[in-house]
Every structure is written in structure tokens, then in C-alpha cells.
Amino acid sequence: MEKARKQYSLWKDAPLPENLKKEAIAIQGDAEEIYDRFCRDMTFGTSGLRGKMGIGTNRINEIVIKRATMGVADYLLSKHEKPKVVIGYDTRKNSAAYAEETARTLAARGIDSYVFMQPVPVPAVSFGIRHMGADGGIMITASHNPKEYNGYHFPSRQMPGCLRQKNLRFPSLTEQLPLSPVPSG
């Protein structure tokens, strides 16, 4: 419970996007909600991250997307001199914004990205990887999960295996990366 309260305080006092700031204020006196949202950090599963959207380390939001992308960027830069990534998104709430945030974060790390200009199905990203000669792909989708959810999915066969092999876990990322905004590239 103490870890969750500390994380909540850090987030509440950080320069967050307006929507997350409002949520931080809304849950201020709700210990159960704070615990649920901040009790753990999301970890990369077999195909990425999936969860409810909202404020917290245990939710999908702009900060979690940035941090995940920074971890993916670090990995790609360790394997490729000038990596390229294809980014797609579905029609869910926030998917387009999360795709844009992903592209900005990659650009800030010197990674070129190709973002679809409209929502696409997951196979389109796999096609884009091959068509553009990219080193990986990211799809913003929660697949079959309810509308309150979103996700950060790796359609490329290479990326999930690479992440598992390197044991790239989200908790280790959150200890190293700040809550401050990622500069745009």
C-alpha cells in the first residue's frame, strides 16, 4: 500500500497531461482506487502491454506509452544503427494519440517511424514492416478486450522474442525513467 501511495504522490505532483491530472485529483481520497492503479507496474507480456486506460503505473496512459517506447527504443538502438519502426492503431479511444506519442518518443531517440494515417488492423503493421524494410512494428490496440482497455502490441515476430530474451520488464524501466515529458524530436 505504501508503494502505491508514493507512486501516486509522484504522479500527482508531476507535469502530467490535463486528462491525467484530473484523474489524479478525482481519486485523491480513494485508497482502494489508488492502490489498484499504482500497486504494480505493467510488464511486457507475450505481445506487449494491455490494460485499462487511466492514470497509474498499472494503467495504459501517455506516460506508460512513453516509458514502454523508450525501452523499445533502447533495445532497437542496441541492435540497429538506424532503426525504423512501423506504427499502427485501431479505432479505440486514445489509440491515435498513443500512436502519435509513440512516434514522437521514437523520434526523440533518433528512430524513424512510419505511422499509418488512419486506423488499421494488426496485419497491416506486419505488412508495413516488410514493405518498408522496418526493424519492428508497434500496434496500439487492446484486441478483444473491453472498450475501457487499450494496449501496446508488437505484431513483429522478432520484437516480442527479443524483449523476452533480454528480460526487458516494465518495472525495471519505471525505476530508471522520469515522469517528465519526453522531448519531441
Give the label of every model feature segment:
Residues 11, 15, 33-38, 42, ...:
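Gly/Ser/Thr-enriched, mixed-charge loops and adjacent short helices
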Residues 46, 107, 183:
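Conserved short alpha-helical segments that host acidic/polar catalytic motifs at enzyme active sites
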Residues 9-11, 81-158:
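Ferredoxin-reductase
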Residues 64-74, 95, 100-103, 112, ...:
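Catalytic cores of nucleotide-enabled group-transfer and carboxylate-activating enzymes in metabolic
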Residues 2-102:
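An N-terminal, well-structured beta->alpha segment
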